[in-house]
Each structure stands twice: as structure tokens, then as C-alpha cells.
Amino acid sequence: KKMSKSKGNVVVPNEPIEKFGADAVRYWAAAARLGLDATYDIGQMKIGRRLAIKLLNATKFALAIGREDENHHVGAAAEAAWNPADVTEPLDRAAMAKLALVVRQATEALESYEHSKALEVIESYFWQFCDDYIELVKNRAYGTPDEHGNVPSEKAVKSARTALGLGLDAFARLLAPYLPYATEEVWSWMHAGSGSVHRAAWPVVDPYVEAATGASPELLTWAGKAVEQLRKIKSEAKVSMKTPILSVALSAASEGVEAIHAALGDIAQAGRVVGKFDLVAKHAEESAAEGTPETEVAVEASELGEPPAKKPKH
């Protein structure tokens, strides 16, 4: 029903702001399309609160990489400056290619006064960036050796850290109109002493296009689907996600196989694949015969190792 003072069904903002935070209430309001009535929706506010918390946590995590001492204390942040030329790995370049696309689409939407459409575009990629990209590159960003003891090169480590920095810096700017308080907080972490995010320039595509150097954003999509299948193997077996995979074969369309192969090291480490990792290209006819969409990744065969021993409770 439409809010009416005479009907006594007016909701004042004090209560939801105190319960969910001002950013969450602003998110709900911003999600409404221009010219249409907005339904009072607590569910939307909860989503906004979750988005703000995720931005805080993701930024805190990324900024801590490389700054922890042996006691896991995080040192003071150096001045945040990320050079797009340092993004050299295929997966990192794909993430930057998608970011360039998102910046362009969000900018065009806002210039057309479609603020809810801009939010939708930004938010969709933000979750992909956190759930897929960060999970895929965090081991490399930390410089963690793989299951065979191979340590990533300094160049590969720097590539991941630079892409993380460029990405989260962009998201702080992109989400500032929607989550003013959370973005101001993360901006102060990344750019201490440089003023407010609300005085910072809106992102432009140039640095992300430079970092992408012609990469396709689809590489990140395929890599995310591959690691999702590796997790599915473990969830269906009801074992810990830390359980090693001794061998696995994944199938996908030929372009998917090519993309997955380009990010195979990151995918294997994220999924804890310690042995043979085969990729099988499927033709459109095969996918159609099996009723599998051409855009999907499937598990053809897998073998799990022993789950890690549980730590005793003290």
C-alpha cells in the first residue's frame, strides 16, 4: 500500500538506519528505478548491508597481503599506487578487461540518469570479483607455493596485487554514490591523507584497458566456472574444501578450454588439484546431444585424496 499519514502506515527512516545502517537504506533507495514507486523492502536493505560489509572485508584482506609479519600483525600501508603495466598474468588482465567494461557501462547509465542500472552493473561484477577473482588469485598474491612447492615469480605476484589494488580502488569510487560511508572508510585505508572518496575523480576506462592489454573478460568467467566445479566435487562428497584432488578432467567448449588453460595454475591452486588436470574440448553437437549448455563446464572424472586431519579442540 502507498504510505499515507492518515492511514498511519508511514515508516520513518530512523529505525532501519539504526538497524541496518545508513548505507543499507541508501542502497535500497538507489535500487529503485527512476519514475517508479519504490516498495519498502527490508530484504533490499539487508542486501545493501551485506554489500557494504563485503566491500570492507575484501579491501581489508587485499591491503593486508604482503604486509603481515610473522605474528600476523599488519603494518602501515604504503601510499597506494598501482601501475597498470604491472598487470601481466592472463587472469589478472581478464579481470581488468571486465572492469573496463563495467566502468563504461556504469558511466553511460549514470549519464542517462539510470542510477539503478548503474548499481546493478557495478554490484554484479563486484560479487564476481570477490567470489571468483579474489579466491582464484589470493594464493599467488600471497606468493604461496603450489602443491609441488613451486613459488610464483615476483612478476606474477605483483601482477595479482596490482590488479587487486586497481579493482578495489575502482569499486570504492563506483560504489561511493550508493554506499557513502563504507566507501569513505575503505578509501581512507587505501589513500590515507588524500581526502575524501567523494572528492575523487570518477573512474575512467583508460587504466583498466591498459592493464587488460586486449584480454577477454570471458577468461575470468570460465575460470570461475572451473573452480566452481572443483568445489562441487568436494561438496557432493561431503568433504572439506581443503581436501586435495588427486586428478580431475573438466570438459567445456573449445573457447572455454582455452580460457581455463590460460589460468590453469590459479585454478589448480584454488581447487587444491595436486595431480593430473585434464581439459576436454567439447563440440557444440556433443553438448546439444547431452543437453549441456555450451557455456558450461562439466566434470568428466575426478579422484579425491584424503581430507586433512581435523585439529583437536582445546
Where is each model-derived feature located?
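Feature 926 captures the class I aminoacyl-tRNA synthetase adenylation module centered on the KMSKS loop
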Residues: 1-12, 17-18, 41-314
